[in-house]
Amino acid sequence: MKYILVTGGVISGVGKGVIASSFGTLLKSCGLDVTSIKIDPYINIDAGTFSPYEHGEVYVLDDGAEVDLDLGNYERFLDVTLHRDNNITTGKIYKLVIEKERTGEYLGKTVQVVPHITDAIQEWVERVAQTPVQGSSKPQVCIVELGGTIGDIEGMPFVEAFRQFQFRVKRENFCLAHVSLVPLPKATGEPKTKPTQSSVRELRGCGLSPDLIVCRSEKPIGLEVKEKISNFCHVGPDQVICIHDLNSIYHVPLLMEQNGVIEYLNERLQLNIDMSKRTKCLQQWRDLARRTETVRREVCIAVVGKYTKFTDSYASVVKALQHAALAVNRKLELVFIESCLLEEETLHSEPSKYHKEWQKLCDSHGILVPGGFGSRGMEGKIRACQWARENQKPLLGICLGLQAAVIEFARNKLGLKDANTTEIDPNTANALVIDMPEHHTGQLGGTMRLGKRITVFSDGPSVIRQLYGNPKSVQERHRHRYEVNPKYVHLLEEQGMRFVGTDVDKTRMEIIELSGHPYFVATQYHPEYLSRPLKPSPPFLGLILASVDRLNQYIQRGCRLSPRQLSDASSDEEDSVVGLAGATKSLSSLKIPITPTNGISKSCNGSISTSDSEGACGGVDPTNGHK
């Protein structure tokens, strides 16, 4: 087993996750099986109770683990399935050691950070490194990312553990890559290497010497700066890798390859890579990177959320939208709308913000209402669902988005004006959304319906089922504590809301569709967690297709995208969507009202453009493996 440890210096958020994932992508392109471990030096057991504003999105794995969003990067980059033990926290390690002490495994010894905590860390890494993450084959390389920066007091036990670990596994099996910031002050206009020198000096003071120094910078770094870092940090020039800010993170593995990373790792770790038998993985990366640069036509999607001030709160949602947009040859234009600003209260308190946010919503080509918790902004989500339903605007609701759509429908189609969720109003007379008793234990951490579960499709035609490839059931990841009240299902269906997916017991509603609407779909599960660049999530793909008036064409072709067209850059002069040529019927024949009551133009002014997305070494599968 080979190990690559990725550490960071100077500042956090310097890009260790992308660098670590890129190492894995390069090695996987050489035919090696790769796994990843993320170490978070906080005392929390997991990320389940984190505020989205503080830590970003909580990513959910197949086994129900709530983990750091970097594990989502690993899964998307490498197209693997990770497990709860692939995320190590200080809380998990201390809990493990304390439990061993309580059962007498330390035979009455004084339990200390060294050796007990450090030994537990090393044993955990060795055990998880042997766990298969793709098929049944054991990984050959394990990439470990240590969160935070060198010098943080929280991370010192882990640094000491890896100081010992390098001797435990021998030098030829251990490589350390240190990611450091090279700032470019405007006052001087030249890169400064002192922060990197200090960071490497501190790392060496802990007993670890970097084999590779990855320099992150705003602009490309000149050869003289690279040589200076080489001289003062005691590494060869070929061991200094310069990664500047790029238009797309698709380019990061390619830039690392150009810097000779594969050749260095092959020699340093004795990987015995046959360079003449490289797989087509990196060629797929090059194709994807080229397409992100050449696609010009835009699709504008409004994300009506509660945590829009910090876009990492919706990291997987954004990536899933990017994957779907790229699949249909569109550049994604994202507009983040704070849901509370759509509420009537804002009209009276801040009318300018109210009208501005509603203008953004009306100008978009499609709407996405993501998940969330709590009462703040819920009425804004409900109003967004109402506008999309009444104005034939394509909409995808996720988790809380489904619940908002159901409540809105009950209020305005069933006449139940007090319809609500017990999360917000426990005493409501018409509880359309209720909590699940078995998941309501009084605690918050780890008490939700989590992980991959089966959703069974109902009989009869369904747009979302066709998008998945017409299977009888699919498996998707969940994270929720509330569900649609089954007592109201028949009343909702009588008015045109179709529950086309349920759990295996047919008691929990998983998917809704609206009859006579271009695309009004909502899911209780989170489809964004299983989206991949070459395998876009079907619900997201449906939203993008409907937003560009191509959904009917896609369905007529049997919901298939051409592998060649997915991998090759397409001309923006083409009027057809990638993989959809030959279809005859378009949603443009529908009379869709696009002008709201307050008269808004059909542009995406004031929106946020984004085109970064991950790549994977997998094949093309329009059903995204949901079989």
UniProtKB/Swiss-Prot annotation:
The active site is at C399, H526, E528. Coiled coil: none annotated. One of its GO terms (biological process) is pyrimidine nucleobase biosynthetic process. InterPro entries: Class_I_gatase-like, CTP_synthase, CTP_synthase_N, GATASE, GATase1_CTP_Synthase, P-loop_NTPase. Its EC number is 6.3.4.2. Keywords: ATP-binding, Cytoplasm, Glutamine amidotransferase, Ligase, Nucleotide-binding, Phosphoprotein, Pyrimidine biosynthesis. In ovary, expressed in oocytes, follicle cells and nurse cells. Also expressed in larval and adult testis (at protein level). In larvae, expressed in lymph gland, salivary gland, regions of the midgut, testis, optical lobe and trachea. Isoform 1 is expressed in adult testis, ovary, accessory gland and head. Isoform 2 is weakly expressed in ovary. It comes from the Eukaryota. PROSITE patterns: GATASE_TYPE_1. It holds the Pfam family CTP_synth_N. The modification Phosphoserine is found at S567, S570, S571, S588. Residues 599-613 have a biased composition (Polar residues). Disruption phenotype: Larval lethal. One of its GO terms (cellular component) is cytoophidium. Belongs to the CTP synthase family. Catalyzes the ATP-dependent amination of UTP to CTP with either L-glutamine or ammonia as the source of nitrogen. Constitutes the rate-limiting enzyme in the synthesis of cytosine nucleotides. This is CTP synthase.
